[in-house]
Structure formats: C-alpha cells, structure tokens
Amino acid sequence: NGVPYGRYGQPMMMGDMPLWGVSVDDLGYQFDDDQINYEVSAWYGLDERRLSLRSEGSVQTKDEKDIDSLTSLSYWKPLSIFWNGEAGVAYDTKNDKPAIMAGIVGTMPYFIETDARAYLYTDGQVRLDLGAEYEWRLSQHWVVIPEVGLSAFSKDDIDNHITKGFNELETEVRLTYETLGRQLAPYVGVSYETALGSARGQRRQENESVDSSSLTAGVKFWF
C-alpha cells in the first residue's frame, strides 16, 4: 500500500529468527551390562537449515570404564514434510577414526520414526546404522516405545571386532511416563542385543556371548 515500515524497519517473521534446542533422547543404565547409555543432540539455526551436534554411546561403570561414543557435527535441512537430511563429519572412539557422514531422518507411514546414517571412515570402511521406533500411547502420560537398531559394515576389522555385513541387532521396549508437558519422561525397559552373520562366529572364537538381554532404566528430556 506504499506505507513505509517506519523507524523500526521491516518486521521479522518468527521463521527468520535463529533458535536452538537440546534433546536427551536417552540417559539410562543397563543393569546386566553395568553400563550407562546416552544419546544427546543439540541444534542451532532456522526452520529451513540448522547446525546439529549429536553424540551417542555407552560408558562402562566397572573394570576399565571404557567409553564408546560416536559424535557428529552436521548441516541439517528438511527434504519434505516428513523427512530431513543431514551431512557432516563424525568421530568414532571405538576405532579412533574420523568419518564423513550423511543421513536421513523422518516419519514413515503409521508414524514410525526412522533414521538411517552412513559413515565413510578414513581407512575406507563404510558403516550403516538403521533405526526405527514407534510410540504406542496408553494414556495421556503412559507410553510404550518399542525400538530397533541395526548396524552393518563394508569390510572386516578384526582389531575392533567388526565383520563385513550386518553385525549387530539391538532392540528395546520401554514403558515411559511423560510429565512436565512431555519435556521429561522417565522409563523402565528391557533390551536385547545379538550378533549377526560372521560376527557370531568371531565372538564365539573369543569366548564372548553372541547375545545378551538386560533391564534398563533412565530418563529422556528436552529443552
């Protein structure tokens, strides 16, 4: 209409303002394995592009207190209404190597949350992580969450107990109680892990168990 914005300038839409967030998707204890598991992510940016920092791993609470973690710094961008893409760099403490990473995260039909991430390490190793979970809401606060994770590698790495192909399957079922506007959710659950393919034979040769189950308890929260 030709009317100037005035001395305060052009108004800024909320979508143009950088925001930030932190999400702790898991901070829990795995009783039979005596370890603390964690999955943390933080982001800063706009609705259409963000910088994302993500770390997941475990800390042994007995013996040598080993720490296994996979940490990535990536550029995040929505690809569609239900899917987001990311690309960046990562570092894996288990094999002590950096990697280039790319992934896609989103919601499949029937509201199944899905993520797929690929890592190319400096030694040429390629790692693929696949994950899925579903929220079965029992009431306003109580939620049952089954989840599954699968990992695969492109070649053998004997030093790090890795074999070519699908290596490990992890599953867990949690009973969660959401409170404080769903920002805080303690849980109890049962987890199960099993080696796959050639990894089963390798573990047997080293007198290690090929599968294990454990009770878990922890909390997830965001702000």
What role is predicted for each listed range?
Residues 1-64, 73-77:
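Outer-membrane beta-barrel initiation region
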Residues 12-18, 31-34, 45-50, 79-82, ...:
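Short loop/turn motifs that connect adjacent beta-strands in outer-membrane beta-barrel proteins
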Residues 18-20, 34-38, 65-71, 96-100, ...:
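Residues that define the transmembrane beta-barrel architecture of outer-membrane proteins
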Residues 20-30, 49-61, 71-73, 82-93, ...:
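Transmembrane beta-strand segments that form the barrel wall of outer-membrane beta-barrel proteins
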Residues 44-46, 75-77, 91, 106, ...:
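Residue-level signature of outer-membrane beta-barrel architecture
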Residues 97-157:
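Detector for outer-membrane/organellar transmembrane beta-barrel domains
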Residues 105, 133, 162-167, 203-210:
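Flexible, surface-exposed loop regions and adjacent strand-edge segments
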Residues 173-179, 209-223:
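Outer-membrane beta-barrel "beta-signal"
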